[in-house]
Amino acid sequence: MSVPAQNKSLFLESKFGQFAVRSTETPKPGPDEILVKVEATALNPLDWKVQSWGLFVEKYPAVLGFDAAGTIAQVGADIPPSSFVVGDRVIAQGWYDATKQTTVGMFTQYVVVPYKFVAKIPASVSFEDAATIPSGVATSAFPLYNQNATAPSVKLTAPWLEGGRGKYAGKPFLVLAGASSMGQFVIQFARLAGFSPIITTASPHNASLLQALGATHVLDRNLPSDQLIAEATKIAGGQFEVVYDAVSVPETLPLGYALTAQGGSLVVVLPADELMEKAKEDGKSVHMAHGLFITPVNHDIGRTLLDALPSLLESGDIKPNPVEILPGGLNGVVGGLERLKDNKVSGVKLVVRPQETA
């Protein structure tokens, strides 16, 4: 596969700054890396938060974007052909380096990634659909199923591992914000693990989507908290041993905590330090989701998930998020991030095609 000398990327030019598309030299893979031609990349709320809130990144200009799908354009010299070859269809995840305060982002036409953190995708899954998967499956699965002793996790048995499928039959499970990207994947993994009933909150127009993914009950997210608590506990027969708050905003955190049983676990996706301290006093656990494959504590569980993903996707056991494709290639990202920031996206993942960048 021929690779151009120049590569267009969307740069965040400075902290709290503006985005701009520029051309730079196309990167080359090291011995244990692959070069991916990015055919589709998905937008995440974290992307606008890095820009607006100044999170994580201190070295600019920086390329953001955490989810991509594409074709392998080059492979490093040390990669066995049995693993990956040029032309393979794959998904990859961007990341930030907490020590260096830098990013490796997917808002680009070509990206170099370590081959150990890449998964193949079946021909039945489009690049656009596949781009919704990496961070969604990681952030939903790791805080539930990571067995590493130091991991912030509920430490359930993963449903893609031996003994995990259907293991938790008859146990209720609660997902707040089920129509979010992560919420959709949490529902699916809970279904595979056997949890029932699976109760979620969402806007009523997303109910049929979430029921198709495995939710048994969809409660209107706009109901008052006391009514939601009453409805959820009535269905479940009490509080929940496991609650996943897929947005973790001030409106949902108290709700999720109130519905978590003593001895139970609440998973959050944004820092909730005060709640974590309160949980220690109340005999509950609050786990902060960390959904990067490249983080060492996630390596073991991440490897098993990446290995299992092709068959999970092929069988339909895991379905990607519904997508909305934004026009203009990388130039469409900024408008999409504004919509995410204004909470004007529901039930779909925004995706762009970097190769269409003018």
Region locations from a protein language model:
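Eukaryotic N-terminal targeting leaders
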Residues: M1-F19, P29-D32, G54, V154-G166, ...
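Glycine-rich beta-strand-centered segment in the early N-terminal region that forms part
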Residues: S2, E25-A42, S52-T99, V104-G105, ...
